[in-house]
């Protein structure tokens, strides 16, 4: 059997005194796999390119657009340093997610299912699904705004059309993960090209932009709150599940240098993609800052700058820079909304498969997620119009801030655990840095949520009885929320599955255990992007 090319190699996994076979999810399949050559060469980087661009979409989605526009309109270039800090933190955290998948052969949602009892695991799944729906709302509204700008389609009709347009783009999944990665990379470059063109025409002061990037400052009322929004919008919970799964589409050499090279190359390719996303965010803030502080701006546009959203930004750019700039903005917004939805659909698939071992076809998964996002978006668009839809994006961002610890804490704990990562667990230094970053992000998000809630109580014009009951239930909810975060932080990891070949200094151990060949098994469900039903396997215990 060892010499047969039709036999798939298998992981040899260990849970203390017991080992079992982690068999492929598709039998006798021949998916479009991306095979990394077993050689020490920088040329291998091209085989790893792709997942970073899918992940980077979350950093340039319509929700980020709106926050960036408001930042530039109200504080010009003063908050650019927040984008720089957040991008550096995002690169570190995303690299941990990639490492988890590379080293263990399982993605974050699967680790959560193996680690936590049934009820906590179910709660984590529900929270992850809510986060994906909350992330989809800005994509729906952003795409609807873009269609309105380009074709004068009413926003509420655009909301309905978003479901159909995304289903068409999801047809790409039948061509495999590589084609999807190339298409998303094209959309990212399209977004970049649009905003770089806007930046070149707006001509912001280069010295002021550099000062905003490297001189931290928070001046004026509301600057701290907007800075928190910028930070909260940069690290998305669904992205951690997505990145840890996408890396499993590569067939990498199972050796010490093979695993280390994979982790290093994934960090480099993620760096390329996130640097491009960083430059796009800087461009949006700079264009907004330059336009709203232009000496040629009229009184009406000055008023729009005080409460700038995606829809108002189109008219603002058209009035100040010309009609072509409005079209470029709409094209970038459309590309952002569609690409974000595609990656969100696949993140939802991996979350459902990982937590529940349940798989749906992409179109059905997209239909369910998009339906939950379209309903509130459609209601708000019909009743509240464009301004109401813009406010819904802010609410969705708050929900994502609330959700982040329930994906971030498990990731930090798993990647720091030798029972899961073996010799590839985070070093003490890396663990300290990542936990500081994690606690800082969580503290910022919790502060943002608490301060927003208190603001509603004090300035929401509520009746006394309503304010009292809202306060009681609100603070009770915060207590439960903090207790849930504390449970994840303080709970000790149990002895969990990890790959023997990846936790031993001697690769020969793997071969003695029954592993065939030098390559680790790619996850065919990830490589094909189909997530089929698991078949029973006689080797599984």
UniProtKB/Swiss-Prot annotation:
Coiled coil: none
Pfam families: Nramp (PF01566)
A GO term for molecular function: manganese ion transmembrane transporter activity
Bilayer-crossing regions: 45-65, 78-98, 122-142, 153-173, 182-202, 222-242, 271-291, 315-335, 371-391, 392-412, 430-450, 465-485
Domain of life of the native organism: Eukaryota
GO BP term (any one): manganese ion transport
InterPro entries: NRAMP_fam (IPR001046)
Residues bearing glycans: 17, 426, 511
Membrane-related topology note: Multi-pass membrane protein
Principal location: membrane
Keyword list, A-Z: Glycoprotein, Ion transport, Membrane, Transmembrane, Transmembrane helix, Transport
Subcellular location(s) of the protein: Membrane
A Gene Ontology cellular-component term: plasma membrane
Family: Belongs to the NRAMP (TC 2.A.55) family.
Function description: Probable divalent metal transporter.
Name by which UniProt lists this protein: Metal transporter Nramp1
Provenance organism: Populus trichocarpa
